[in-house]
């Protein structure tokens, strides 16, 4: 939804059930200007949904039913009609996980760039299957715990984590660290920033996704400008934290990304 609100022509490929919840999803996406004709409908399973349990501090527990979402199959991925400048992949679970490589290879075949915010299913793939696919990724976004798990490098050894990730991913790697901010590397330069201070802390649901989509949107708006992408991603995440739910606070084209101030972004060269 971030891409559409920021003015990019956006479509989504997904699977929903033939139910009231699925129809509401379609209406919401259409209202935001997202093309929905590539969304498949499963006649046997309900649409995915989540129940979010919030604490007074804004932390939360999320109970998720994946439903039709995890049943996306090759027949639901219309390769002959999918052409874009960018593909943005998030968690593919269940049967849908089998499409991970298919989507990456299709994106490269049509000359698109690919951003991936992986889920547990992708992170748990056997190394010999995952590493060739990482070579197809232009922007890889994950949190520090996930980065430590994937690389098998202790959480505290940030430099070693990035050395491995940079050797696997030819493009940009962004590792978020909650209150610790974010570090981004393109293999030769590393950028680090803290976080923007929200005016009110309501709900952290969707903050990570908001950073990821905001970061990639920044690269669409200003190609190659990583500091701008970090600022936009951080502002988008901060805005989402100030609202209930994962969608309400997503920034639009006219929203200032400097509302919470300008991030101090540190830059340093790193050896290959």
Language-model-detected regions and their locations in the chain:
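Short, conserved phosphate/pyrophosphate- and ester-handling motifs at nucleotide-, phospho-/glycolipid
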Residues: 3, 143, 208
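Gly/Ala-rich phosphate-binding loop of Rossmann-like dinucleotide-binding domains
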Residues: 4-5, 220
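Active-site glycine-rich loop that binds ribose-phosphate moieties when present
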Residues: 69-77, 98, 123-128
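Conserved phosphate-binding/catalytic region of the ribokinase-like
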Residues: 155-272
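Active-site-adjacent beta->alpha loops and helix N-cap segments on the catalytic face
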Residues: 96-103
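Structural detector of well-ordered beta-strand residues that form the stable sheet scaffold
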Residues: 11, 88, 114-115, 174
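Conserved N-terminal subdomain of the carbohydrate kinase-like
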Residues: 5-89, 256-272
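Conserved phosphate/ATP/ADP-binding segment of small-molecule kinases
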Residues: 104-105, 110-113, 119-192
């Amino acid at each position: 939804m971030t891409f559409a609100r920021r003015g990019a022509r956006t479509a989504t490929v997904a699977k929903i059930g033939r139910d009231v919840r699925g129809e509401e999803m379609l209406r919401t996406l259409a209202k935001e200007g997202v093309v929905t004709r590539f969304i498949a409908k499963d006649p046997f399973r309900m649409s995915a949904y989540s129940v979010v349990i919030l604490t007074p501090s804004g932390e939360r527990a999320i109970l998720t039913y994946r439903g039709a979402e995890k049943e996306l199959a090759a027949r639901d991925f219309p390769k002959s009609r999918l052409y874009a400048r960018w593909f943005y992949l998030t968690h593919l679970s269940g049967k849908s996980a089998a499409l991970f490589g298919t989507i990456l290879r299709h994106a490269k075949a049509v000359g698109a760039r690919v951003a991936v915010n992986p889920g547990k299913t992708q992170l748990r793939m056997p190394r010999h299957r995952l590493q060739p696919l990482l070579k197809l990724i232009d922007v890889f976004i994950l949190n520090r715990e996930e980065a430590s798990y994937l690389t098998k490098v202790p959480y505290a050894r940030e430099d070693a984590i990035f050395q491995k990730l940079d050797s696997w991913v030819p493009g940009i790697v962004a590792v978020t660290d909650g209150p610790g901010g974010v570090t981004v590397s393109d293999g030769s330069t590393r950028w680090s920033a803290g976080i923007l201070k929200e005016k009110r802390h309501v709900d952290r649901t969707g903050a990570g996704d908001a950073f990821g989509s905001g970061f990639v949107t920044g690269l669409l708006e200003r190609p190659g400008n990583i500091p701008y992408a970090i600022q936009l991603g951080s502002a988008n995440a901060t805005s989402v934290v100030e609202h209930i739910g994962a969608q309400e606070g997503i920034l639009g084209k006219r929203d200032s990304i400097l509302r919470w101030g300008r991030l101090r972004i540190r830059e340093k060269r790193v050896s290959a």
